[in-house]
Regions:
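Glycine-rich phosphate/cofactor-binding loops in nucleotide/flavin-utilizing enzymes
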Residues: 135-183
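Generic structural signal for well-ordered, non-transmembrane alpha-helical segments
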Residues: 47, 76-83, 112, 116-123, ...
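Hydrophobic packing residues in well-ordered alpha-helices of helical domains and bundles
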Residues: 42, 68, 75-78, 107, ...
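Predominant activation on well-ordered alpha-helical scaffold segments within soluble catalytic domains
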Residues: 46-54, 76, 86, 90, ...
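C-terminal helix-coil-helix/basic helical segment that borders enzyme active sites and/or dimer interfaces
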Residues: 57, 61, 83-117, 127-138
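Generic detector of well-ordered alpha-helical segments enriched in charged/polar residues
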Residues: 30, 57, 72, 90-93, ...
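Glycine-rich beta->alpha junctions and the first turn(s) of the following alpha-helix
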Residues: 1-83
Length: 183
């Protein structure tokens, strides 16, 4: 994940001809590609989380606090959060990129859950890092401040409640056990 900025572009006066148009009406939001593609930004989130995790480990080594039991517990919890995010991303990518094995609705449901699981794991990891490092993690030029700020911003993807309820709506009527729900 790289530092980013938000801005605006003015396309007033730019002519768009028929040869400039890609695809057809409705292509952009066609499922499962639209929602299913969300695994890609979840992968970026996981990358930001990995960077933050590495910065935490470096901080603990540099300060000699890595053996403190409270710091070790937070580092262990951070490792769990990071691995959780990576596992969800990997499975969401498989579901979305090999769609023939699953229905469109199943793909959308799974990727929606994955993006929310990664968001939760990212928020948890940031809290653990901030608690471990303390005030330094909020002050520039500490790299933890920048990575945390970027990750916190990018984790906020649109429609999280809709993503969750859409997934739940697919899950409810499924006539299989939890073990077979995503197979």
């Amino acid at each position: 994940m790289k530092a980013s900025a938000t801005g605006a572009l003015d396309f007033s006066g730019v002519a768009v001809g028929p040869d400039d148009i890609l695809g057809h009406d409705g292509d952009y939001e066609r499922q499962p590609y639209f929602s299913g593609g969300a695994w890609r930004f979840a992968a970026v989130h996981a990358g930001g989380m990995a960077r933050l995790f590495d910065l935490l480990r470096a901080h603990l080594r540099e300060t000699g606090r890595g053996q403190d039991p409270h710091q070790a517990a937070r580092l262990g919890q951070a490792a769990i959060a990071l691995e959780t995010a990576k596992l969800w991303v990997d499975q969401a990518a498989l579901a979305a990129e090999e769609p023939s094995a699953r229905s469109t609705d199943a793909i959308v449901a799974y990727v929606n859950l994955a993006r929310l699981a990664v968001e939760r794991a990212g928020l948890d990891l940031m809290e653990l890092v901030h608690r471990s490092v303390g005030l330094q993690s909020f002050i520039r030029p500490n790299p933890i401040e920048r990575v945390s700020r970027d990750l916190a911003t990018y984790l906020r993807q649109p429609g999280p409640d809709r993503a969750l309820t859409t997934a739940a709506a697919w899950i409810v009527p499924q006539a299989v056990t939890a073990q077979d729900l995503w197979r």
